[in-house]
Amino acid sequence: MVCVFGAGGGKLLRFKGKILSMEYIIQVDENNREIAPIEKLEAHRRGLLHRAFSILIFNDQKQLLLQKRNGAKYHSGGLWTNSCCSHPNHGEGLKEAAHRRLQEELGFDCELEEVFSFSYRAELDNGLVENEHDHVFIGRYDGPVHPNKDEIEDIRWVNLEEVQVGIQANPQQYTYWFRHLMQHYADRIIQRV
């Protein structure tokens, strides 16, 4: 890992040939209490528990919007996952961050309801570790979607049954956290759709 400086003086990191900005997310304890700000890549390199969110957007036909992560992402690139997922920045509220990322990644905003949270840990194939306390939001939307190509390769609307069959048949095509979410919490999600 090499530290470089951007044109605006911001600190950037080069990791495995990719340049990443220094984003500070929220390290938490097992009860989701804030411990300290932590640089995002450092949290993933050290496997530190941190706050995250996953957004599930459904249309009027009860189809879920999936995104295929851009292959250049620092982890889990080219895999299918929930509509939107990210981390609140240090000093930013969860719901505020969820709305911000929905607009940045998919080009729209809608009402979001936080429905539950869960924790998981996964060692990724590139040596990074996801160790997250993940807050799940559900929203409804039927308008146009404008994916940010820096974040997303593709999108599609699918029925939940289709997702479950796809995960069972080809788990390697989906992110770990989305598989975990659908395998352990699908009933809670279905009740809210």
Predicted ranges, named:
Residues 42-53, 63-100:
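Conserved Nudix-box catalytic region and its N-terminal flanking loop in Nudix hydrolases
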Residues 11-21:
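Short, Lys/Arg-enriched N-terminal segments with co-localized hydrophobic residues
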Residues 21-54, 60:
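Acidic, metal-coordinating catalytic segment for phosphate/diphosphate chemistry
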Residues 41, 78, 90, 116-121, ...:
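Nudix hydrolase/Nudix homology domain
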